[in-house]
Amino acid sequence: MVLLCDLCVSAPSAFIPQYIGKYTRDSERETLNRKLVVLALTIIVYCCSITPARQGESSTKEDRAAATRVDRVVKEAMLTYKIPGVSLAVLRNGQIILLKSYGLANVEHQIPVKPETIFQSGSIGKQFTAAAIMILVQENKLSLDAKISRYFPDSPAAWKDITVWNLLTHTSGLGDYPPEIDLRRDYTEDEFFAAFKKAPLDFAPGTNWNYSNVGYVTLGILIRKVTGKYYGDFLQERIFKPLGMTTARVISEEDIIPNRASGYRLVKGQLKNQEWVSPSTNSTADGSLYLSILDLAKWDAALHTDTPLTQASRNKIWTPAQLSDGTTKGYGFGWHILNLHGHRLIVHGGAWQGFKTHILRFMDTKLTIVFLTNSWETRDFKFARALAASFYPSFALPDVNVIPDTDPKMTSLVRRVLMQFNVGKVDEQLFTPDVLRLVSIKAIQNKLNAFSLPVAIINSSELVGISHENNERVYRYLLTDFGSSLVCTVKLTQDGRISAIEVSSI
């Protein structure tokens, strides 16, 4: 069955722009603001009617109960993180069982989100780049074991052992965009590649794992070299059009595109439009796609079939990468692969230009959850986990209250330090003399590396406590992944140095 939510266009949505995304120290005004936002969201969601479809699976009591929980999770997230709009779908066996739209696609013009609304999807686009590569593999036009130097003869000597498989699995040693890449400047593919070549590899190909946007940009260039077509055109021809993904396409700020959502961010508590980037940096194969929730529902349905990807191809895509030392990393081709709470999941998120998104596929129960949001403030890993818990209580979030972050400079410092621990290299000047003799850098690194995407989760850490102890300030931060949570406790001296740091599971 399908639980359809048709969002009516109604005047009460006008409440949202006045209050969403604004913080105030005046508690009475804050309470009023929250009540008005609750009222606005309640009126908007009240316009949604849940009706059974003529085809598909029958409704179950569990589905209806879960739908109620999902609704509560979405509303709470929108209020907590000041998210203007959300589009969400839940599918089982490729059939939609819940489709809902919340809030505004465009705050300035009071345009509500609807199922046809298209969002920038960020790195969700990587799975489509990977699918395009596998189509070429299926047609014997490309080999996963092929050295990319065959297609890039001017690549540096350090790249000689990088294979197509390495690029797909983030095991190539290529890092992220080098410092000389300015996201506000246009580049040709040759100019991108010239900048990539200058950067040293982070490690020898196949020996380690590091999430690499550069690797997927390179895959997009490779698709053109093999097919003679821009990767976006290849996706249209071989995936989007055949599957009826009628609004899926590469991002364009210039084109007139119906139902396009606007992206937003908070600046000092005020809602602002997304930051601008150049057209060329918004058209690369690491995640530059417009997608609606309906497009992604059709994609999920296709992943239950042998079109466009055969079972053999899907198996390869969803196999965790194995490094040269025999260890495995929880990433295949454009998907994280996780085993959590007795479930096997394949997941991926996206974060780009005022949008955050996620798709979760429970492979054992054939349940898929997809959401698209138009706010950079969305804690997408935490949001995804809360939605999963609506169906599987073992994914429930820890009972820890997030508090307003009144010291963003401290938060920035803690995140910077955790980033250093994540790579195993810390700046000793940030600490008092004895700390690093008492703390195991490797132990903290191992805890952080257990996250599916440590960098993203560190950057989404949330303040959960501030106290004072022996003339020192004590800060506690929550880090949340799909199946686990950590609390980082940091003590700070009066001169601003870290006197203690602990990362513990909860």
Regions picked out by a protein language model, each given a short descriptive name:
Residues 61-121, 141-146, 189, 198, ...:
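Short, conserved catalytic-motif segment at the N-terminal edge
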Residues 71-74, 88, 94, 118-145, ...:
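Active-site SXXK
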Residues 373-439, 443:
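Short, gly/Ser/Thr-rich active-site loops of penicillin-recognizing serine hydrolases
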Residues 425-471:
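Short solvent-exposed beta->alpha transition segments
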